[in-house]
Amino acid sequence: MSEILELEAESRTEFGTGAARALRRAGRVPAIIYGAGKTPVSISLEEKEITKYYRKPAFISQLINLTIDKKKYKVLPKAVELHPVTDIVRHVDFVFLEKKTQKMEVPVVYEGKERALGVKRGGYFNIVKRRVTLLCDVNNIPRNITIDVTNMPMATSLKSSKIELPKGCSFVTKKEFVLATIIGRRGAKTEAEGEQQAAEAGK
């Protein structure tokens, strides 16, 4: 099961630019929760706390239990507005999680790409997809998808059909797609080219 973050929030009844500025001066961040056919709920969060968690990896796929007026709501971050200079969180959109499954974007981590076989032979690891869209069980939402690519040779593609996803998750699209490739740098020889030239030299 995914790790669930516990956060406290307060309801807010005043809206508009002036009300938002007053909240921020008080060290709080305006936010809203919507979706799942529910009436949107306007809330505020402690600025330091939400900014701290936003700066951690994969916040946008973080499952959260929000406590508002002693009631708990299971939510996911949808969009985050930052201050253009300080990167402090200024506003957050959350979505209610009421369905058994949720469509969401998840970061992809390519483990060992610097040590991949094709890279060692002079190739370049080309990332095509940094995030993928999955349909996930809401109780098992992955923070990211980690793929070990250390054995990936030169001139190959990493395709979605070869990826083992966490239990309860599937790609939204059924069509096969490429996540990453290892391509030859200018002047670098692929393994096949090297073998062919060696064979010709031995004739």
Swiss-Prot record:
One of its GO terms (cellular component) is cytosolic large ribosomal subunit. GO terms for biological process: translation. Keywords: Ribonucleoprotein, Ribosomal protein, RNA-binding, rRNA-binding. Pfam families: Ribosomal_L25p, Ribosomal_TL5_C. One of its GO terms (molecular function) is structural constituent of ribosome. NCBIfam families: bL25_bact_ctc, PRK05618.1-2, PRK05943.1. This is one of the proteins that binds to the 5S RNA in the ribosome where it forms part of the central protuberance. PANTHER family: RIBOSOMAL PROTEIN L25/GLN-TRNA SYNTHETASE, ANTI-CODON-BINDING DOMAIN-CONTAINING PROTEIN (PTHR33284), RIBOSOMAL PROTEIN L25_GLN-TRNA SYNTHETASE, ANTI-CODON-BINDING DOMAIN-CONTAINING PROTEIN (PTHR33284:SF1). Part of the 50S ribosomal subunit; part of the 5S rRNA/L5/L18/L25 subcomplex. Contacts the 5S rRNA. Binds to the 5S rRNA independently of L5 and L18. Belongs to the bacterial ribosomal protein bL25 family. CTC subfamily. This is Large ribosomal subunit protein bL25.
